[in-house]
Amino acid sequence: MEAPEVPVGSLIDFETEPPTSPPLEAAPSTLQDPDGSLGDGASESETTESADSENDMGESPSHPSWDQDRRSSSNESFSSNQSADSAPDEETLALREFMRSYVEKIFSGGEDLDQEEKAKFGEYCSGEDGKGREWFARFVSAQRCKSKCVSEPTFYRLVQSFAVVLFECHQMDDFGPAKNLMTMCFTYYHLGKPQLPPTEPREKPAGSIDSYLKSANSWLAEKKDIAERLLKNTENMKGFFGGLETKLKGPLVRKNEEDENKPKDRQTKTVTMISPEDEQKGEKVYLYTHLRQQPIWHTLRFWNAAFFDAVHCERRKRSPTTRGDAGEQEEKREKWCHMTQEERDDSLRFNENITFGQLGTFTHNMLAFGLNKKLCSDFLKKQAVIGNLDEEQYKLLSDHIEQMATE
């Protein structure tokens, strides 16, 4: 594929023109809060978490560089770029403090949320300015620095709160908080009881993110269990060491012992065994398994807008020309005409790798949310052309979609 000498963002069709946002002003230090600032929290998996999970929330809301970056990309992203960082007033401070307290109660797992708090939460999340949705997404993302594994009560509180916010995001076409909550859907989990029907074979796919690891652990546990039973069971132990006593008995006794051993052999082939550690830990149940029916996931406009924003933020975060010395030199290096041929090749390769990684993440998430294979393939084809991926990269992603669709 020939590399187009135009920015990626100008080719993406959002189907509706995003409203222009007024210039943003950095909030005073009164809005500064440790919970609003996120560190480089590691993702659960490179294949399950978008690489831009730290994009909008990697810095404090009042940080100058955050405000500058948001200002420069406000017309290139989507409508959710209306920031919660406007001039502080009593209403803004009250909203922010409420969302902080609300999220803390969700993750504490102790104090219950009363009906008044739930009603106020719904009111804030339905605001047209999107501040309530944005602050909720930020505070939820900040909690992952503490722990990604949550208790069962916290898990279902998150499911209910996510459902409210995602519905309002769909109604308002507010794709920013929805994109960040999409990442959180593959981050937070609780440990459920492993479901192991005795009649199903071990080879049946587990249908979860950790299916490959669990199948390997199950195989090892099965072999360990067989060895333990050989040592504990008297008859098996005699057979294991040569069956000396069996040879002294008559053919009838030997026949009875063979009949007893046959069902046991069949059982070891059909029952999935798990290690004691897995029994204690249980199976990871992620938020996305309970939020597949949210209408925003089935809107292609969301995926186009979210993908563009993810690629844009990843380039801005990783590019050595945008995170080093600012000023005229940066502007010159950003212009294609001022780049050497080697710099152009490196820039193209750099952008292709980012697009490839984000497409792998997004197509995985789309399939996990229940989108059909054709829709995912069409999305991949469109973005691969825009991102100038080569045939090998495109084939790898296509094969990944086929593999996940069959599973």
Curated annotation (Swiss-Prot):
InterPro entries: KIAA0513, SBF1/SBF2. It comes from the Eukaryota. The modification Phosphoserine is found at residue 275. Pfam families: SBF2. The keyword Aminoacyl-tRNA synthetase does not apply. Residues 74-86 have a biased composition (Low complexity). Keywords: Phosphoprotein. Residues 46-57 have a biased composition (Acidic residues). Residues 1-90 are annotated as: Disordered. This is Uncharacterized protein KIAA0513. The gene is Kiaa0513.
